[in-house]
């Protein structure tokens, strides 16, 4: 049974670092208290999601009267709350993803928040004191994040590549006529530097092509205001979270000439087929306290994932989507598209391996729970590969991975109707990059 907060109080080394939007409260901090948990790292995670998760988790444990106070820096907050008459605190610092690993290593944090995966160098530095942060017991994918690129409804443009986006927002392409549009200057609208939204765009688009945001871009502190500005200007283009598309047109995004442009929806972000999607993480050391481990487990639970949805991010709870035939796709693929539905998860693999990545291992458990509630339906697994190596070998590898997922399901009593391999066909990402190849190595899950 999970320990109570009172039991955790004995462990003074426990700490969590998170960043949040302060909730309304009149409570004042009158005493210096050692934080029960310290959560440090990503502003994208810390701004809204972390505070919501931590309050819900602590309330479940018996906490009440929550009050957030800003500390020395804007991104440093302290949560004060009461637990059975005792005053307790949680520390949340959101100075950026890299600080998650630095502060874990220097014992300034108990939990790290990150909007990117831990690097090999960070894993190596932390190995001796924190354990292997890349392993499933220490790495927790808590949400998915997607960015929509929006233009005015009257703009004829429908799709764009990430490279062209980088050239537009860096100012290299400055007129819509250069993209086959009207003879108008492109008006760039962007979120402010402190926003997780800009951080996402910067990492997935600008940095990818070694570009920087143009000085001519108008900056907004509010996604709502940015979206409204796009709707009022036929020459404008901007980027926002999925919840803020409003009256505008969202563009389909491709990663290159060989990939199909994909529109941003909660489904395409959930499957990670959409180019401007990314994973959000919590990291806990192997030696983390029971309370820290319980919090990470709560975040990835069905209840935690429902809270993810409420904050505007994309959860990993499974949803069903109707699929349509794709022009040029194999006939067998399109036959399934006519009669089946697709589930909002893809299983992905490390290069050259049949072993699921950490998200895949947890998604397997989610799929099993989903099928227990949909016991009359059957699954079809479709394997895909990157384009490195011979075509026949890639098709064989894609089949082997799909069969690896089948074995895991069948051994747990979940029936699989068919296993297919489409090899390197129908790529969702550019095979010229490591990240693109990783996204193409996937097993799609269909419901018949």
Task: Annotate each PLM feature.
Residues 162-181, 298-319:
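Periplasmic-binding protein-like
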Residues 305-310, 315-378:
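Periplasmic peptidoglycan-binding/tethering modules of Gram-negative envelope proteins
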Residues 99, 384-448:
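Periplasmic OmpA-like peptidoglycan-binding domain that tethers envelope proteins to the cell wall
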Residues 147-155, 271-273, 277-289:
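A bilobed periplasmic-binding-protein/Venus flytrap-type ligand-binding module shared by bacterial periplasmic
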Residues 72-84, 101, 110, 194-261:
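Ligand-binding pocket segment of bilobal, Venus flytrap-like solute-binding proteins
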Residues 19-169:
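N-terminal segment of the mature folded domain
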Residues 122-138, 246-270:
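Ligand-binding "clamshell"
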Residues 48-50, 135-216, 221, 227-231:
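Extracytoplasmic ligand-binding site segments that recognize negatively charged/polar headgroups
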